[in-house]
Amino acid sequence: MKMTAPLMVTLLAAIGLALPSGLLAAESCVGCHAEKTPAAVAQWRQSAHGKAGIGCESCHGSDHDRILKGEAKVDLTRCAPCHPKATKEHQASRHGLGLHTGWGCTRNLPDRKKDECRFCHRQGDEAPSTLVQCARFLKQSSEMAHVGCNSCHMVEGSCDSCHSKHSTDLAIARDPASCAKCHMGPDHPQWEMWQTSEHGILNKSAGRKLGPDCQSCHMPAGTHNVSSGITMNSGGVPYPAGQRAKARDEMVKICSGCHAPSFARRELEQGDAVRSQSLAILKEAEETILDLNTLGLLDPMPDHRPPHPLSGFQLVTDAQMLYEDTSHIERLFFKMKKYDYAKTVKGAYHQNPAYAHWYGNAELKMDLIDIKSEARRLKERKKAEPGQAGIEEELRSLKGRFERGALSAGDYAKEKARLLDRGN
């Protein structure tokens, strides 16, 4: 006869034996929660935790008032003591930086919540555990920050981002749909790319043995380090050569489970080439905007708009750039960098021709056309104003390019001499 937890409690009590502490704690909760949250109790009873006698208090603690207030979070610190290997792998991966890359210090916000401090500070420790900030997060309302940002970025400290809360059925975490909750949309549509790639189509028609899924390539052998084999940061910028070479060897090894190593390396190197070409297009657009800023032609200029949460009244074109409180040309650049560059590069690495070309590369190049056209319009508008000194403007633009490293000292001197000769 299969012995249920309640029956075990009754029998052990009847013969005077001590109850396992976890099971005893669990039963003190189950009596009430079987009525109030029956689904959670049913899931726990069928889980590995329930069958091993790991009770509610082991994860939730015993302070019922804090639990009801939502203050007793079941986060990674609760899971780590029993799952040290998975925790170490997770923390070494990009998922281990998920919260910090999507967060920002809220101490100066009028509607800040005090419990947010715990994401970057340990209890009683003023030194932050990370200096990473996210300007876009800081511009959102608290509701949007929770729903639209933290729902995904909590993956750093919340195991139930991928696993369920009370069930321990690994089929849930092994389902690629669990990745789609976050890895989809205009800025990183890996889910859509995989679904419509040859890998995804084979997976749907013939299963994992013929068509690999997210976990096959990014969590081989069940590792929680989802960053194995990744050669660039989340913004698509390549890692240093040594780190990149090591990661490439890791990915070739993963691909070699189905493909010849030489074939895998060639395919990945094609992705590298697409990345380099795309980055050059992106840099050309960025240089156009930096030049307009030097000339004072952005509309509005950074000092005539609400301050950037991290940089104040400075132009920002890096990973902290905003999609609000900017000029129109910066809005075009945001789409180019955050959406179209990412689709081009990640589409290439995920072997999806439509995302690499039409959704990515074509849009990237048309973005550059739009940005250059807008730059010409702004410059022509300035020329139409009375008292415009053309040579002085060109010299200022030239100096700005030199100071940003876009021109060598030799080229700067040559172009400067040419402009001065023209002005004489």
Residue ranges and their predicted role:
Residues 1-8, 100:
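Positively charged n-region of N-terminal signal peptides that target proteins for export
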Residues 5-8, 126, 223, 397, ...:
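Intrinsically disordered, low-complexity segments enriched in glycine/proline and serine/threonine
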Residues 5-6, 12, 27, 38, ...:
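Low-complexity, intrinsically disordered short peptide segments enriched in small/polar/basic residues
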Residues 8-22:
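Bacterial N-terminal signal peptides
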Residues 386-424:
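Alpha-helical, heptad-rich or low-complexity scaffold/stalk segments
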